[in-house]
């Protein structure tokens, strides 16, 4: 039978019309009526659908897709190139079910170069970081590297937390109409990013209630997935209510019992490393047989930590060390997340029609990666990336996002006392202050301003608006963080999830100097020690990421850490287990406003002019009185 050879569409981005033509060609290639580009013959192959191994198998590839899988030598058609790897086991490319690429602090093309050698060939991008900086350009940003040829497939989920609460402003705003457009625009949009504002889900009086349910409705209408975030929700009424809302998953589980209660109410559980060993051992002892509702996630892993630990392959190794069968761990990286995100036609298994994403293991039990293939070609050898990194000059809409049209001055951080007062009462919170009430302390007044109290580990913390152009500042006193070293401050433009600038310091002058350095950098880190700017790290894309290799970024971060070790940092334990002594890097996450936070500091805006607000109730309060 004579077949007309038509040009096959480029399937870097998935569209329905192109998908039809690609699959028409794959049908004929599988039947042997059209030639295949290459075959990859392996010692054995894991079918993740049945969790079974087959010996001496061949994966036949056409374009970027798998056309045929079966016993070596039995493919009926012509193959232009043959590759034989007899000593390795083939498993599907690993998928990140829930990841904020922004937290690697690398742009997508450099993220690809970092994670692909770890087997991570596709990522569901939980996009409420960049979308809170430039919501209008969100999909364009996430598709650009792929459009330019990057092998990493990114499936964006527009953020439900844009803004995170009704009391924050700037950078982006998403509601029902925006989500409906996103879902209609691309088959690669899988749904709605983690719903974090739990009070806005259950309380009809919450000012975000209508916006959030509108986004959920738009996602349901397109048969998308609504991802959840159930931090702190451990009682059965709350878990049942969360599941009843249609929120499909949780990646915040901390205990085995919480994990079980959520699994048995139908939630898809995405395990991070923090409690993985305990949870996996407990579930095995419990006798869990069906692990299909479980996947592994790195969530907010930085480039430095990925260089040190690995990507989701590290999570899987921890699970295997805890006693999980390697084949089940691989399912938790492949078919489980693909099914959950409804992406099985494209990724998640070594089967016809899927992208040619293959991880070749030299040791299955240790999950030792020999090679990674993506889009049907080899892109890594051991830990070395050998694929393409597109050269992208990111435009101003991505690189000019710190919009502060003035110089910040020390007096901007003063908290002026009432005339004649020797002391003032102050509202005080701590990093990760999950308590429903703030502390009240009496603080001294000097030169008309309320002062820090080092003896009580009280310092000053501020949020600087970077979107309006005015550089509006909310400031208050925090406990148990920040520098004791005089004239010292650290500032950062990564402030989850609205990503204004946060700064903490032992003097107002040092705080101003650090923030002004970030304005000039267009985002990143700035450390001022004893009045001198001693270290900066550049996050020039969105104030969140940098367009360079992980190794180059890590070198700059290590220099920051080295200078940070010369500072005497205050520290007190808090509610969150991952709050550590020393350089306060995790203050990036102490600005979160989702559940279980109550009292928080946000940049001043119309919805929260004082900046200090209870996001559970909407109550505002002065920071001094």
UniProtKB/Swiss-Prot annotation:
Cofactor(s) required, per the database record: Mn(2+)
Swiss-Prot/TrEMBL keywords: Hydrolase, Manganese
One MF term in the entry's GO annotations: adenine deaminase activity
Protein family membership: Belongs to the metallo-dependent hydrolases superfamily. Adenine deaminase family.
Annotated S-S bridges: none
Record has Manganese as a keyword: yes
The keyword Manganese is annotated on this UniProt entry: yes
Organism in which the protein naturally occurs: Bradyrhizobium diazoefficiens (strain JCM 10833 / BCRC 13528 / IAM 13628 / NBRC 14792 / USDA 110)
EC numbers on record: 3.5.4.2
Protein name per UniProt: Adenine deaminase 2
Pfam families in UniProt: Adenine_deam_C, Amidohydro_1
Reaction(s) catalysed by this chain's protein: adenine + H2O + H(+) = hypoxanthine + NH4(+)
GO BP: any one term: adenine catabolic process
InterPro entries: Adenine_deam, Adenine_deam_C, Amidohydro-rel, Metal-dep_hydrolase_composite, Metal_Hydrolase
Signal peptide: none
Major enzyme class: hydrolase
